[in-house]
C-alpha cells in the first residue's frame, strides 16, 4: 500500500463535542462536515473542556486526526474554580492547589507530555501553575511566596508612584519655562524666621 502524501498538518483546539465548520478548519483543506462529525462523536463524553487536535490532511482530501488531553492551564483553573490565570504571577497569587490535585492533573496530562514519569510531569504542571499565579501546597513555600508577591506588589506601587511624581515634576518644569520663578535659599528662610521671632 502506497503512503499517502501529506499536504498539511494543523494543530487546532475545539470545545469537546462542539466543533463546527469555520475559518480555522477551512485553511486545512479537508471535508469540514465530516471532520466535525467525527470529532464531536469522539469527544462528546469529555464535557465542556477544550480539546487540542492535530489534523493531518492528505493530497486526496482525506484526513486523520489525533486528540490530546485538555491544556494543563484549563485543568488547573478548573481545580481552583477560577476563570483565568494571574496577569502578573509575581505580584498576584490567585489560588492554591493541593498535592493531590497536582498529582491528578499530572497523571491526566501524562500521555501528552514527553515523559513517562508522573513525578516529572508534576514538576511540569507545578511550573505551569506558578506561571499562572497558582501555588501548590506542600510543593511551594506558600507563605513565603505570598510574602514575596506582597513585597513585589508594594515595590511595583512605589515605582509607579515615583514615576508619576517624576512626570508631574517634569510637567511643572515645562510649564514654568520662560516664566519668572521665586527662589528662596535655605539660609534665607532660616534667617527670616529668626527675624520674625
Curated annotation (Swiss-Prot):
SMART domains, per database record: RL11 (SM00649)
Example of a GO biological process term: translation
CDD domains: Ribosomal_L11
GO cellular component terms, semicolon-separated: cytosolic large ribosomal subunit
Posttranslational modification: One or more lysine residues are methylated.
MF annotations from Gene Ontology: large ribosomal subunit rRNA binding; structural constituent of ribosome
Pfam families: Ribosomal_L11, Ribosomal_L11_N
Keywords assigned by UniProt, alphabetized: Methylation, Ribonucleoprotein, Ribosomal protein, RNA-binding, rRNA-binding
SS bond partners: none
Similarity comment: Belongs to the universal ribosomal protein uL11 family.
Subunit note: Part of the ribosomal stalk of the 50S ribosomal subunit. Interacts with L10 and the large rRNA to form the base of the stalk. L10 forms an elongated spine to which L12 dimers bind in a sequential fashion forming a multimeric L10(L12)X complex.
Role summary: Forms part of the ribosomal stalk which helps the ribosome interact with GTP-bound translation factors.
Matching PANTHER family: 60S RIBOSOMAL PROTEIN L12, LARGE RIBOSOMAL SUBUNIT PROTEIN UL11M
UniProt cross-references to HAMAP family, sorted A to Z: Ribosomal_uL11
Name of the protein in its database record: Large ribosomal subunit protein uL11
Organism, scientific name: Mycoplasmopsis pulmonis (strain UAB CTIP) (Mycoplasma pulmonis)
Lineage: Bacteria, Bacillati, Mycoplasmatota, Mycoplasmoidales, Metamycoplasmataceae
Gene that specifies this protein: rplK
Amino acid at each position: 500500500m502506497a503512503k499517502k502524501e501529506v499536504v498539511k498538518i494543523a494543530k487546532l483546539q475545539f470545545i469537546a463535542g462542539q466543533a463546527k465548520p469555520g475559518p480555522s478548519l477551512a485553511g486545512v483543506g479537508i471535508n469540514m462536515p465530516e471532520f466535525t462529525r467525527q470529532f464531536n462523536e469522539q469527544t462528546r463524553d469529555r464535557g465542556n473542556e477544550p480539546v487540542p487536535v492535530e489534523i493531518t490532511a492528505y493530497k486526496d482530501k482525506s484526513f486523520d486526526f489525533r486528540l490530546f488531553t485538555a491544556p494543563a492551564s484549563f485543568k488547573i483553573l478548573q481545580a481552583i474554580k477560577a476563570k483565568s490565570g494571574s496577569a502578573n504571577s509575581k505580584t498576584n497569587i490567585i489560588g492554591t492547589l493541593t498535592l493531590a490535585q497536582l498529582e491528578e492533573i499530572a497523571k491526566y496530562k501524562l500521555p501528552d507530555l514527553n515523559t513517562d514519569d508522573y513525578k516529572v510531569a508534576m514538576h511540569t504542571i507545578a511550573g505551569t501553575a506558578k506561571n499562572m499565579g497558582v501555588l501548590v501546597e506542600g510543593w511551594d513555600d506558600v507563605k513565603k511566596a505570598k510574602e514575596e508577591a506582597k513585597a513585589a506588589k508594594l515595590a511595583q506601587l512605589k515605582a509607579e508612584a515615583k514615576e508619576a511624581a517624576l512626570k508631574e515634576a517634569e510637567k511643572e518644569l515645562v510649564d514654568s519655562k520662560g516664566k519668572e520663578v521665586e527662589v528662596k535659599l535655605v539660609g534665607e528662610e532660616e534667617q527670616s524666621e529668626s527675624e520674625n521671632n
